[in-house]
Amino acid sequence: MIKKLIVNADDFGLSEGVCLGILKAHRDGILTSTTCMMNMENIEKYLEMTKAYPNLGLGVHLNITVGKPLTKVSFIDEKGNFKSRDTYKNREAIVLQEELYQEWKAQIEKFIKIIGHKPTHLDSHHHVHLLKSNRDVVLKLAHEYDLPIRQETYLQKDFEPVYFCLLYTSDAADD
């Protein structure tokens, strides 16, 4: 059967509540896919929970704006965390391409090591893969791993995004 609609939730791994909400939306709703933040502290534990949902597509949510890097990079703050998304407001912030390539490759490889197969697709936290300075890196990785990229060009439209946020606890996910 060909998938006609993919409904994807970003940020799997950001927190337990986010992960439980995503799993509940898949189990009880129309969510078909999620993308995983591989540099988050408890990602192994959270990915273990996905084994109960074999029809949930799992991609990698490439990240350079939250948490600690998996590799040695220069685009970190004084605490060793990635610089915030505000660093990239002008959409042209300079990141060393080889460092970016190694970091994102490490995130993909960590996913493969934990899950045992390649991800379904790539996208990125705060859409940083769409920055001109980062586009070649994500395209190179997509080609290397033979993966689709969600939204490979930046939309230039006048619209207001709508954000939905639900607070889930471990009790709520079992409802």
Regions found by a protein language model. Give the residues of each.
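CE4/NodB-like, metal-dependent polysaccharide N-deacetylase domain
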Residues: 99-121
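Active-site beta->alpha N-cap acidic-glycine motif
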Residues: 1-67
